[in-house]
Amino acid sequence: MTSAEQSIADYIRLLDPAERPNPYPLFARLRERGPFRIGTAPVVIVPGHADCAAVLRDPRVSVDRSLGKLQLSSMLIYDSSKTTSEQAKPSFLFLDPPDHTRLRRLVSKAFTPRVVQQLEPRITELVDDILDKHSTAGTFDAVTEFAYPLPVTVICELLGVPLEDEAQLSHWSSLLSRTLDPTSRHAAEHQVDPAELQRAGTELSGYFERLTERRRATPGPDLLSQLLTAEDAGDTLTHDELISTCALLLVAGHETTVNLIANATLALLRRPAELAALRANPERAQGVVEETLRFDPPVQLIPRIAADDLTVGELAVHRGDLVVMLIAAAQRDPAAFPDPDRFDPSRDNRHLAFGLGAHFCLGAPLARLEARVALTRFSQRVEAPRLPTDPPVYREHVNLRGPAHLPIEYAAIRPR
């Protein structure tokens, strides 16, 4: 087998559920190969840190999936009750400047670090409420009973979604997050009936349509009401843009934050000294979050479309090619991170987990805050936590990485 054939074989192995507990040896081999093409397919794999950073900043590389030679959806939600021309426009996740710049400018004021920081008391209260449900010694699932409830509650409260609707929105979010994984069409156990995805998109779109109308009639202090009146130099969000933005905030902001919290919790439980250090000094939480984003990122790869011909490393990339940046490989690149396979919350971190450039993750301040608060309160309140089994069973996603379940045994939950 040639080196190129071995790289393709290793990339395909990433789809194997048996590799989910530890895909990083595969990523290391792919990184050693450098940028490569998947046979004759219009797909280029970029595994190194410097190359990924360069591609993320390159204006010739687009998020507009309609420019690609492969058929990839640019819709987070597809409402089957509407014709193609009536569909809500793609969210700014799949738009390039100037459309992306305009939409992001209208939405970004709600997600600045200063604004997000004001949510810390409420997020702390939510985390404590979750932990209070486990007041006696025993076990709990740190995914379904800790990491999962927090982000959906936060985003639903931000949008003004009634408490009784949170479970339904969580279900839609879980289904529709699969559209964020470009490998899902190839992973058999990950495939979902397209009709089920369309039904979820139709129901979610209809839900936000009805909620928007209620907020137009009776505005509140929530983010949806703010987005309805958001204005910049006389510009406002159209109705379709508003629906797409709400869907993006829910789908993209929920699953990724769940995985960030779960991956960080697992990293700490595997390293009792780090957990003890965090308990003694809560200021270390931010370093734990940033190192988790590098060491075991919740988003493993970032897809883009080449809008023009370019060169990555020594590899020619053609217009219309799908360019897949292996962020999980790049963030263990020894050329960028000394001793990259060591979990070190004190390191100087230049990770790419939130992207770079114009498409840097809008929700990064909120995800960081939620994870920091969750880990701090976990370390302070959960007495003698341990993993009864390791490794855990991982979720179906190749791109969105996190355990499906994370059982934890503990001695007690300390009072608030």
PLM segments and residue spans:
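Cytochrome P450
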Residues: 1-416
